[in-house]
Amino acid sequence: ISGLKLDFESREELKKYRLNDFCIGASVYSSIADFNREYLLDLKNYKKEVRDFLVTSARIYLSFKNYLSKRKTDIVYLFNGRHALEKPVIASCKASEVKFFTHEFAYNGGYDLFENTQPQDHEYRYESIEKVWRNSKFSDTKKIKIGSLFYQQNLGRQQGNISLKINQENIEIVKNKYEALDKLKTKKVLPDSWVPEKENIVWFPSSEFEDYTAPEFCNDKTIYSSQIEAIKKIIRDTNKHSDKHWFFIRLHPTYSLFHTKVQEQNQYESLQEEFKNVTLIYPESEHCSYFLMENANKVLAFRSTAGIEAAYRKKPVIMLNKHIIYKLNSVYAPKNHNEVLNLILDPTLKPLDNRDAIKYGYFCLMSGILPKYYKRDLKRSYEEGWGLFKDTRVTPSYLIEKIVLPLSNRRKLSSVRHFINKLHHKI
């Protein structure tokens, strides 16, 4: 790796950088974007991290490619696949024509497998919805009951944090302890600016940075180049035709749990200065998102699960990104800006049939594979180590927990690791 490029002048230069057929720059960008949920990185702040990730990622790619060339391998399994330490494994498998599966948390407490692709592949997920519904052993009546539970128990934000038990008679869903979400308190109240005589539209934007972490699958922005551009253009043009519309932009409550303010929040805050008919609902607000959508005249979303949750509740939903939910028949799927405006300005717009919403709910609860011997301790959160193997708690050994981990955080050892990394750069 002596010829590996380590310094970059711009984000685009880094994202386009490749090692043979491996998009190493994009995978490094994806990992660093996770640090502070940034979609527009200032590379000057991450020079060391960029170099460290590039070196490590290149070593994994070349080493694993060499491993596959010397050993017959049937299948490779790995987690997620978009980060700098996982993507090189996928690149090695593709170069060696070896079958691979990525795995990710499933809604139902199990895990999902993705054959020769990643969890971010929304085309793969969309095709799986109908397959899971069609291949189910349950009657349509029971499938509808299971799919409806996803919405009736507000499980949209509980991904990977429920335990599901289904038998011939009963369906039991238990929400696991979830330290982050359990801190969020909500109230069923509407904002002071909510006027019943107005056309009240609730907008659920998604995190921008996620669109930059798996660029090969982020091909769903067919109408607008960014969410903030879409919001400004839609509100500006709506106001040219009507003074009856009021937009409530609900920033995701989990933003309040991050250690830094999400990068795009400043842009959202400026909307209230630019437009008089906008109310920004902050992440830390106690306004219940479900109560907002239940009272809305219309709901807008890009790729948020809130879109399909509102569709189940028989609300007219307009999806703006060509993502999984956009393709379901329970939501409106405009193809251009004029179609978006016509839907927003239509005072008689009706909700669509929610059968596809039910299929989506069923898919979320039933697509995950439940392990045979592993389950969750319902009284423990992920952060507390919720794993039970054959009913025995899975914990690090005393040596790891009491000696290795504390020592690894000491400054002297950190300096040693930094020195070793420098040697690696020179090799």
Roles of regions detected by a PLM:
Residues 160-269:
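Conserved catalytic-core segment of nucleotide-activated headgroup transferases in glycan assembly
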Residues 67-69, 194, 291-295:
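Structural alpha-helical scaffold elements that stabilize or flank donor/cofactor-binding regions
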Residues 1-58, 105-181, 374, 378-391, ...:
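Conserved N-terminal ligand/cofactor-binding loop architecture of enzyme catalytic domains
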Residues 316-362, 366:
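Nucleotide-sugar donor-binding patch of glycosyltransferase catalytic domains
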Residues 85, 111, 284-332:
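A donor-sugar binding/catalytic signature common to diverse glycosyltransferases
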Residues 265-283:
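Nucleotide-activated donor-binding/catalytic signature segment of Leloir-type glycosyltransferases, i.e.
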Residues 60-116:
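Conserved nucleotide-sugar donor-interacting segment of glycosyltransferase catalytic cores
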Residues 98-107, 247, 280, 317:
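Hydrophobic beta-strand scaffold residues
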